């Protein structure tokens, strides 16, 4: 899945504008979760791991970027931070709409599976 940025990331003197997105893997999810954890001290002096939901989201997003033009992904957090607000919002909205579309397909398949069980008909060719 591809989208175009307004400002993009610089590669030498050339702005890279075309973003290619990819499916997240289980490894991506685990790596993002670990990257979003920080060791903090409680007032009692105990060390605990704290997870930042916002950081987790950005870690997932940067891993979902397969490339930005000539720049291979996943992009670094530094590169993600260097995006303009508009470009970051564009990527975020695109990723959210892509995930929503995939979720709707799963729900639709579930409806077909349920209809298949109720009618005894093979509806797999419909999807």
Curated annotation (Swiss-Prot):
To phage Mu protein gp41. Residues 110-121 have a biased composition (Basic and acidic residues). Disulfide bonds: none annotated. It holds the Pfam family Gp41_Mu. This is Mu-like prophage FluMu protein gp41. It comes from the Bacteria. InterPro entries: Tail_Gp41-like (IPR056974). Residues 107-127 are annotated as: Disordered.
């Amino acid at each position: 899945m591809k989208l175009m940025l307004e400002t993009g990331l610089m590669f030498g003197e050339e702005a890279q504008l075309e973003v290619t997105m990819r499916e997240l893997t289980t490894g991506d999810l685990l790596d993002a979760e670990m990257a979003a954890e920080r060791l903090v001290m409680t007032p009692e002096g105990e060390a605990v791991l704290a997870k930042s939901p916002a950081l987790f989201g950005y870690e997932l997003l940067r891993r979902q970027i397969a490339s930005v033009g000539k720049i291979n992904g996943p992009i670094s957090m530094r590169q993600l931070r260097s995006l303009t607000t508009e470009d970051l919002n564009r990527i975020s909205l695109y990723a959210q709409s892509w995930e929503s579309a995939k979720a709707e397909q799963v729900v639709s398949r579930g409806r077909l599976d349920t209809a298949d069980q109720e009618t005894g008909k093979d509806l797999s060719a419909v999807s």
